[in-house]
Regions:
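Mature catalytic core of soluble alpha/beta enzymes
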Residues: 1-307
């Protein structure tokens, strides 16, 4: 499934649908798998909630800033004049239009990037496969017990068979946990990945973090000046966000149609460009943030604390 997922959504694969959209000189109709529907729904919601600051069309800005499929980390000479929706870059819902749920329609080449929610959505999909597999196995066990009266299970075995599977999926900053006993998760210090600034407890739901510290590069403006660039952009102006250092988001399992990790992943990015109070009118979540002055904020229901 991971290969199928990347074949549809990865802008780093030459054979992906996303790459075909970026190479289509006159645009076209691009049919994605049915499983992509909820992901596109989530991007619709994030785009609206952030007033366009979260936009899959930011892929073009990332390329201009050097975060391209070749990972050149070289900023284009005219990038400053072409970044963002303010300078005419394509916009989700206008230049990329959804048709029939999972068909994207364009009229020209558009470089899209589904990284804000994509990894979290993959985690949820894998979690769904684990759950479905266990439910299918349990169903077969119960069927055998019904058709074979001599096959008896103890009370504890029956409870174990009917219980939802326990698992933790760790996708490097994106966690999905279904455990009876909460697990402790360190809040990584964005200035020093060997240290933590806090700790959280996660048991049933998703927990995602975002920070520019692990994906950043420098470009020389001149001999004296070097500009720090990272992948967390405001899609309106196309520039890397400078005021926030790290975000952490917790979302319960039932959120957004059963895609809590995708929601947490997207919100961890959205908190770089939007106020949490505005986002809370659309999404149910708890969060913590750390700004460039090391000032921490934490919501009342966040399942953790700063040191």
């Amino acid at each position: 499934f991971i290969d199928e997922y990347e074949h549809a959504l990865s802008r780093f694969r030459a054979d992906s649908l996303v790459t075909h959209i970026g190479n289509a000189e006159h645009g076209g109709h691009f049919d994605f798998p049915d499983w992509a529907g909820p992901l596109f729904d989530l991007y619709d919601a994030l785009h609206a909630a952030t007033r366009g600051a979260i936009d899959p069309c930011v892929g073009e800005d990332l390329i201009r800033l050097g975060y391209d499929p070749a990972l050149s980390f070289t900023v284009e000479a005219d990038a400053g004049e072409r970044l963002g929706a303010l300078h005419g870059r394509a916009v989700w819902g206008r230049d990329v239009v959804r048709s029939s749920g999972t068909t994207l329609v364009t009229r020209s080449p558009v470089h899209v990037d589904f990284g804000a929610c994509g990894k979290g959505y993959l985690v949820d999909s894998l979690g769904g496969l684990l759950t479905d597999s266990e439910l299918s196995r349990t169903s077969h066990v119960k069927s055998a017990e019904t058709t074979n009266p001599t096959c008896q299970s103890s009370t504890s075995d029956s409870k174990r068979e009917s219980a939802a599977p326990e698992f933790v999926i760790d996708a490097g900053g994106d966690l999905l946990a279904r455990t009876n006993k909460p697990i402790r998760v360190a809040l990584e210090d964005p200035d020093d990945p060997s240290c933590a600034v806090g700790v959280a407890l996660i048991g049933d739901g998703a927990f995602c973090a975002s920070a520019p510290s692990r994906r950043h590069w420098e470009v020389a403006v001149n001999e004296q000046t070097h500009l720090a660039i990272h992948h967390l952009l405001n899609a309106i102006d196309g520039l890397p966000v400078q005021q926030t250092e790290a975000t952490w988001v917790a979302v319960r399992s039932a959120s957004f149609g059963g895609y809590p990790t995708a929601v947490a992943d997207g919100l961890a990015t959205a908190l770089f460009v939007a106020d949490p109070n505005e986002l809370s009118s659309t999404f149910a979540f708890d969060c913590a943030t750390l700004d460039v002055d090391r000032h921490a904020t934490i919501s009342a229901g966040f399942p953790g604390r700063f040191f």
